[in-house]
């Protein structure tokens, strides 16, 4: 989706081949966009010229800002979407985009000539020639669904799997392994007793993902609901573990599942002392009565699913419309990719999304956008585009998977980012719009609007640093009245704003010329509160930038580097990274290895 839009909007004739045109941009698991770190990726996609944020704003039915009681670095939006409307609007955008052509087609082979992509071939034998191919296979590569001991091949429930592609790429040297993920059952709304659950309404504050849209307050017609499992639920699960493809006597699933989205079986087995687990009951859209049971992913048999669901308060008479299931699929080793998401093995082949071992719509969309941008830049003969870890969560994610690899489905987390205070929800457009404009995906008027915003923020901060106030009785009485300590010596408004308990709004009584722009005020408040921490982080990024500037020649022979450990030699020969900063993040690489490499590179030059 994002990949195809990027290449087409950058002027290249693009064919989007998909096995089901009615499920373009479909949400096969939770009907939601965003969440911790994920919501920030959606904002970053928007700042770079992608579409996800805009369509989320158009189709969201319940939205909340998460972690509002915590620091600014972990705040993020999460929205329930109308999944049918989301898919339809995305499909319509694709249909209306110049240079972009949709085709209902199932690709089964990729042809390579002299180490470069030549074409793809579908199941009808039709060959599509191309100088750049972006593969976004999701869970479709040799996908297999498990519901108890019942198994069948599928890309997701209701869709055929992709057969032949894995084998096609393996013969060129691309390595594949298996992962597993799962999704909970869907329940008919009229069979749910919501009076036994805790209601969670949409935000009372106006919110939106895209900078192009105006924040809105949604109607309260589509709340989410909170309920809990109990000992009866857990006893049914324990009693039936022998029927689980994960825990049965015959383990049918070999692929590793996601750590941060475990099945209910995993929770019960791994946390036996916990007597309840929360379940969020989420609406799937405006035109359906189906609800998603967030937190109740399982691969147990249908009969067991129904029995355990009916032990949960509010779900005693639940009617399952679609069973929960686990799905196992192939993914490619992401260490065989450059940071541009182009394959190191096959020139012109780009991989994005779950095929790279990641999980989640947002992670996939972010990768798709980067892959699409780089495919277009490659065809233009221009420098490739990458984001580093201090610029975006997208950069953190890509750097993680291509340097460290994955041994479980990768999910973006705020804890993965060393510079998360720089990578906030509120400043995504200030961070990245210039890049989006330079690439050609952000319009000039929008970029100029961002420049104006930056100028206003800078001017106002400078003004606040110059406006001095004295410790008069009147001023100290006011400060005491708003529960902050009085002044002992003259200070600036900016210094007062640095206090954690003071807002810009409260300073109006002391300020001769306050401003009214909420956008500017938000940035000023955050700058004041976190100025010292931000300055420290910016200093740390300089150290990282110095390591990044030490590039590694493609022809380097790691076997010739004195004092480089055997472990480092083996890993670096396999991954073939481009600079010392990337090398420093590889698990098992020691400071001594880094020093040996830097010393050798100096003599090499």
UniProtKB/Swiss-Prot annotation:
Its main location: cytoplasm. It is found in: Cytoplasm. NAD(+) binds at residues 257-271. The keyword RNA-binding does not apply. Homodimer. Heterotetramer of two MnmE and two MnmG subunits. Belongs to the MnmG family. This is tRNA uridine 5-carboxymethylaminomethyl modification enzyme MnmG. The gene is mnmG.
């Amino acid at each position: 989706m994002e990949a195809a839009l990027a290449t087409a909007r950058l002027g290249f004739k693009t064919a989007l081949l998909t096995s089901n045109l009615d499920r373009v941009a479909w949400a096969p698991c939770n009907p939601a966009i965003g969440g911790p770190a994920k919501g920030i990726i959606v904002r970053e996609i928007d700042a770079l010229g992608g579409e996800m944020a805009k369509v989320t704003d158009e189709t969201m039915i319940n939205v909340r800002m998460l972690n509002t009681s915590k620091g600014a670095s972990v705040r993020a939006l999460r929205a329930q979407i109308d999944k049918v409307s989301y898919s339809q609007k995305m499909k319509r955008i694709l249909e209306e985009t110049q240079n972009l052509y949709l085709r209902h087609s199932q690709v089964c082979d990729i042809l390579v000539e002299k180490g470069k992509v030549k074409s793809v071939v579908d199941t009808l034998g039709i060959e599509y020639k191309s100088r750049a191919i972006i593969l976004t296979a999701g869970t479709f590569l040799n996908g297999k669904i498990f519901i108890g001991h019942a198994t069948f091949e599928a890309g997701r429930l209701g869709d055929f799997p992709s057969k032949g592609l894995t084998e096609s790429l393996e013969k060129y040297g691309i390595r594949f392994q298996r992962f597993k993920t799962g999704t909970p059952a869907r329940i008919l709304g009229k069979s749910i007793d919501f009076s036994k659950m805790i209601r969670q309404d949409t935000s009372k504050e106006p919110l939106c993902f895209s900078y192009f849209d105006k924040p809105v307050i949604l109607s309260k017609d589509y709340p989410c609901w909170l309920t809990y499992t109990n000992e009866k639920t857990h006893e049914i699960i324990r009693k039936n573990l022998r029927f689980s493809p994960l825990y049965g006597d015959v383990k049918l699933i070999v692929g590793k599942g996601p750590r941060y989205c475990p099945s209910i079986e995993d929770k019960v087995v791994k946390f036996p002392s916990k007597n309840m687990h929360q379940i969020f009951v989420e609406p799937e859209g405006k035109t359906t009565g189906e609800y998603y049971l967030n937190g109740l992913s399982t691969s147990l048999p249908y009969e067991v699913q129904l029995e355990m669901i009916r032990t949960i308060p509010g779900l005693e008479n639940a009617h399952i419309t679609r069973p929960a299931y686990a799905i196992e699929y192939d993914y490619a080793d992401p260490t065989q990719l450059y940071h541009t998401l182009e394959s190191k093995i096959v020139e012109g082949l780009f991989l994005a999304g779950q095929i790279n071992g990641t999980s989640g719509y947002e992670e996939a969309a972010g990768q798709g956008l980067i892959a699409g941008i780089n495919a277009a830049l490659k065809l233009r003969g221009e420098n490739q585009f990458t984001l580093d870890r201090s610029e975006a969560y997208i950069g953190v994610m890509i750097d993680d998977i291509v340097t460290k690899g994955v041994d479980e489905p990768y999910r973006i987390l705020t804890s993965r980012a060393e510079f998360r205070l720089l990578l906030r929800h509120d400043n995504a457009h200030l961070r990245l719009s210039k890049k989006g404009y330079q690439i050609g995906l952000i319009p000039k008027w929008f970029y100029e609007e961002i420049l104006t915003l930056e100028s206003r923020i800078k001017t106002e901060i400078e003004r606040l640093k110059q406006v001095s106030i004295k410790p008069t009785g009147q001023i100290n009485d006011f400060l005491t009245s708003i529960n902050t300590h009085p002044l002992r010596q003259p200070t600036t408004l900016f210094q007062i704003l640095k206090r954690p308990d003071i807002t810009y709004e409260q300073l109006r009584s002391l300020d001769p010329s306050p401003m009214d722009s909420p956008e500017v005020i938000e940035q000023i408040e955050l700058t004041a509160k976190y100025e010292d921490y931000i300055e420290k982080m910016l200093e740390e990024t300089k150290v990282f930038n110095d390591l990044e500037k030490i590039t590694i020649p493609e022809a380097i022979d790691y076997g010739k580097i004195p004092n480089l450990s055997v472990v480092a030699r083996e890993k670096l020969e396999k991954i073939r990274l481009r600079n010392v900063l990337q090398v420093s993040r590889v698990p098992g690489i020691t400071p001594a290895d880094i020093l040996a490499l830097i010393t050798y590179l100096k003599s090499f030059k």
